[in-house]
Amino acid sequence: MVDILGERHLVTCKGATVEAEAALQNKVVALYFAAARCAPSRDFTPLLCDFYTALVAEARRPAPFEVVFVSADGSSQEMLDFMRELHGAWLALPFHDPYRHELRKRYNVTAIPKLVIVKQNGEVITNKGRKQIRERGLACFQDWVEAADIFQNFSV
């Protein structure tokens, strides 16, 4: 993810800071554009949380997958509350990082929630991640891994 997040830092729902490059290396990355005040975001986030948990947190062998939340919330407190209430143990771009706006433009985010699945170089695998998870569940992940050119023996 050097190409799109570079030397940036990401945060956890507990407030810890991690280096984006180390946290996202050799993983399929889902950029999750959402906000607490958005009813469709509040509806989809628990489903994404279950998807993430099944692939990463509770898996015998964690999948090469990470979600990066790109908040459209009105304040850092609103973002943090949303993360603590409904999110999985995934990462987020800090609220005060202006790069949030650049990512929205780069990935043509005109409505939320939107889940954009990207390769390590930032190239889009699909901008319909939300729809694919709703329709296909865990089965869509294998397609993402193959498209991401991550050579790892993984099966759902």
Swiss-Prot record:
Signal peptide coordinates: none
GO biological process terms, semicolon-separated: photoreceptor cell maintenance; sensory perception of smell; visual perception
Gene3D superfamilies attached to this UniProt entry: Glutaredoxin
SUPFAM superfamilies (UniProt xref): Thioredoxin-like
Location of the Thioredoxin domain: 9-147
Protein origin, superkingdom: Eukaryota
Cystine connections: none
CDD domains: TryX_like_family
Known function: May be involved in the maintenance of both the function and the viability of sensory neurons, including photoreceptors and olfactory neurons.
Family from the record: Belongs to the nucleoredoxin family.
The protein, known as: Nucleoredoxin-like protein 2
Source organism: Homo sapiens (Human)
Lineage per the UniProt record: Eukaryota, Metazoa, Chordata, Craniata, Vertebrata
